[in-house]
Amino acid sequence: MSYRKLGRTSSQRKAMLRDLTTDLIINERIETTETRAKELRSVVEKMITLGKRGDLHARRQAAAYIRNEVANEENNQDALQKLFSDIATRYEERQGGYTRIMKLGPRRGDGAPMAIIELV
């Protein structure tokens, strides 16, 4: 299995990817470094595929990974509910390729290449 280390221990890396995945599901567009965006893409694609499956086991697998954060204040919807009700239905006909990565310029502080990752 090939993945990027991202300069972190395995637990730190998993926690960071869980946070970024939850943020992308809630906001549908985030700005991060290019390598984080490329690593995040595979995780988010798997979560959306679980959402499209829609059965109880898929929901429990996604719930084990996605953080329990409120996605929508008006209807009190959390990130998991948004994944299964809004995002999964949007990509029902699409076979993969749910995200887009657009490169930005370098970050001002340290010159790290930045990118925007968003749901298509």
From Swiss-Prot:
| Protein name, entry field | Large ribosomal subunit protein bL17
Molecular function GO terms recorded: structural constituent of ribosome
**Transmembrane stretches, by residue range?**
none
Complexes and interactors = Part of the 50S ribosomal subunit. Contacts protein L32.
Provide one Gene Ontology cellular component. Answer: cytosolic large ribosomal subunit
**One biological process term in Gene Ontology:** translation
Species of origin: Bacillus velezensis (strain DSM 23117 / BGSC 10A6 / LMG 26770 / FZB42)
Protein family? Belongs to the bacterial ribosomal protein bL17 family.
Ribonucleoprotein: is it a keyword of this entry? Answer: yes
Q: Which UniProt keywords apply?
A: Ribonucleoprotein, Ribosomal protein
> Keyword Ribonucleoprotein, does the record have it?
yes
